[in-house]
């Protein structure tokens, strides 16, 4: 049986931890409100942008002069997976779920005879893939020390991806991230980046009350696409970063809430054990005193 001093120290330690987890829950809740608002504001723009690029890709499928960023380079040998994770832990299964999903996709592609390359966004994804897929990583990014994610951050990542594509390091690029559904739910999701998915327009417009429509391009296709294609990559990456940020805070708030409640239950059990031990010690001392008095 543990001593009273050990139990008191244990109770004090758990109470201290409970204060920390409660504070982290409150901080995550405050950050979640802003992150959720940003993610929800960016989502329609990214969705319509993807739909437009999908429509353009479908229309340009037979055009031999169509930009490679739009329709691909005609090859399907090397796949780049851009994995978006968090820079910090203590968020339940948030990071593990997207990392495992990306690893499963990589292994599936390899089983099909494809080559896989990785671009990790976030320290948790970087550390995860450095352990067993270090040689496949061609780029890394994180936001350590930054309070907010800016569009310029997404543009920088997009520029690195475009440069790698132009250098022939991959043929197909897919973005993987945790899509924010609710505080309790963050779902690993995929978005095609290169080439633009021709089926994306129909899929996105199926859930939209706005018609797809025909696009009139001015002054000409080349001028517009030269600017629009890199921006589309940046928009999709930026939206994924915001979705992931909101999901991270939701997962952390849930994890810290569970930790706080578990700490409370542990404190109750330890306190009960402490009281029982103290009562047993007092009873033992009384018996010894009474036995000593009877002996006299």
UniProtKB/Swiss-Prot annotation:
Q: What is this protein called?
A: ATP synthase gamma chain
Q: How does it assemble?
A: F-type ATPases have 2 components, CF(1) - the catalytic core - and CF(0) - the membrane proton channel. CF(1) has five subunits: alpha(3), beta(3), gamma(1), delta(1), epsilon(1). CF(0) has three main subunits: a, b and c.
Q: Where is this region: Disordered?
A: 194-216
* Record localization: Cell inner membrane
Q: What HAMAP family does UniProt report for this protein, alphabetically?
A: ATP_synth_gamma_bact
What the entry lists under Pfam families is as follows: ATP-synt
Q: How does it sit in the membrane?
A: Peripheral membrane protein
Ranges annotated as spanning the membrane: none
UniProt main location, coarse: membrane
Any GO BP: proton motive force-driven plasma membrane ATP synthesis
* GO MF annotation terms: ATP binding; proton-transporting ATP synthase activity, rotational mechanism
> Its GO CC terms?
plasma membrane; proton-transporting ATP synthase complex
Q: Please name the gene that encodes this protein.
A: atpG
Q: Which family does it belong to?
A: Belongs to the ATPase gamma chain family.
- Keyword terms, alphabetized: ATP synthesis, Cell inner membrane, Cell membrane, CF(1), Hydrogen ion transport, Ion transport, Membrane, Transport
Q: What is the annotated role of this protein in its UniProt record?
A: Produces ATP from ADP in the presence of a proton gradient across the membrane. The gamma chain is believed to be important in regulating ATPase activity and the flow of protons through the CF(0) complex.
The uppermost taxa in this organism's lineage are: Bacteria, Pseudomonadati, Pseudomonadota, Alphaproteobacteria, Acetobacterales
């Amino acid at each position: 049986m543990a001593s009273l001093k050990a139990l008191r120290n244990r109770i004090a330690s758990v109470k201290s931890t409970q204060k920390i987890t409660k504070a982290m829950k409150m901080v995550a809740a405050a950050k979640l409100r802003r992150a959720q608002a940003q993610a929800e504001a960016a989502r329609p723009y990214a969705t319509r942008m993807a739909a437009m690029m999908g429509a353009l890709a479908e229309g340009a499928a037979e055009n031999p002069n169509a930009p490679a960023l739009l329709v691909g380079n005609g090859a399907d040998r090397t796949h780049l997976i851009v994995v978006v994770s968090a820079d910090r832990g203590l968020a339940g299964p948030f990071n593990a779920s997207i990392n495992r999903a990306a690893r499963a996709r990589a292994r599936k592609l390899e089983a099909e005879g494809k080559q896989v390359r990785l671009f990790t966004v976030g320290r948790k994804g970087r550390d995860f893939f450095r352990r067993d897929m270090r040689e496949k990583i061609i780029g890394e990014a994180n936001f350590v020390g930054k309070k907010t994610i800016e569009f310029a951050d997404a543009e920088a990542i997009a520029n690195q991806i475009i440069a790698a594509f132009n250098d022939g390091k991959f043929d197909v690029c897919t973005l993987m991230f945790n899509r924010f559904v609710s505080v309790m739910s963050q779902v690993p999701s995929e978005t095609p980046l290169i080439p633009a998915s021709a089926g994306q327009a129909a899929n996105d417009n199926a859930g939209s009350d706005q018609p797809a429509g025909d696009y009139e391009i001015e002054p000409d296709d080349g001028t517009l696409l030269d600017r629009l294609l890199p921006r589309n990559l940046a928009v999709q990456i930026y939206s994924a970063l915001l979705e992931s940020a909101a999901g991270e805070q939701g997962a952390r708030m849930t994890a810290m809430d569970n930790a706080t409640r578990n700490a409370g239950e542990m404190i109750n059990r330890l306190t009960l054990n402490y009281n029982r031990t103290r009562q047993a010690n007092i009873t033992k001392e009384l018996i010894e005193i009474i036995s000593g008095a009877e002996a006299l």
